[in-house]
Amino acid sequence: MYQHTHHLDNQSILDVRDLQVRYNGNLALENITFHLHSGERVAVVGPNGAGKSTLFKVVAGVLPSSSGEVSIYGSGPRSHICIAYIPQRSQVDWNFPVSVADVVMMGRIAKLGLLGWPHKRDWELVQRALETVHLADLSKRQISQLSGGQQQRMFIARALAQKSELMLMDEPLSGLDAPSQADILSLLDTLKSQGVTVMVATHDLEQAAQYFDRIMLLNHRLIGFGSPDEVLQPAMLIQAYGGRLRKTEDGKNLAIDDSCCGEGETHEHAH
């Protein structure tokens, strides 16, 4: 079971040092080192198969590392209840018979313990979280009946009810229409105002540059980590994307062809 761990004000919320992860003898992540501070909003970008999901799972304590160190406020991920991990929607069984409110209440279970029973205060926090993400009127609906955007907002509500301090979101904008993406990005502003540190895996470099404080460019190793202007440079992008990177016809933009983004879809970044 998770334990409550005291947090010091001057600590980094997340420290990753010399992280390596192997799958069946193959190196998925190599020599990854970075630090995050409270309230930061970080986009994690890189080609399909670069290790973004693997990184999130290791930080969340879902997967073990082969070597290196991951610490949340100075101790391992499994020592904390402040981490919220939101997987890709394709990894969720949406036919599981559970309501929206029940899923959001799961954010309180870590606080209560497996044998704990929700109190009035817990349901009030669930209701408040649902109101924040504009799903209060859908609280009794089965999760299979939600749209893609509503599904992502439900998971954000669960993290809010959990009172998470570090949120890991694996491609939350993928497959959503523009209004739904705008809703999620607006909620990221709400999280930032509450001091929540957010890491978001995304394939959209324009959104990464516009909405995030820092960008992590990943392809099994850490190629760049800094402000959008520092990281979204042609030399670094070529290291990460290789042959997927090309100039657009006007010669002013860099376009990335990435099969995971959809048939024939490209993403551009101006330089």
Task: Please report, for each region that a protein language model flagged, where it lies by residue.
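Conserved ABC ATPase signature
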Residues: 142-146, 150
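The feature captures the beta-strand-to-loop junction immediately N-terminal to the Walker
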Residues: 45-47
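Conserved ABC ATPase "signature" region
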Residues: 105, 120-138
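ABC ATPase nucleotide-binding domains
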Residues: 233-234, 238-271
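Conserved ABC transporter NBD signature motif
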Residues: 68-83
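Catalytic Walker B motif of ABC-type/P-loop ATPase nucleotide-binding domains
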Residues: 167-171
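Helix-to-loop junction immediately C-terminal to a conserved catalytic motif
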Residues: 60
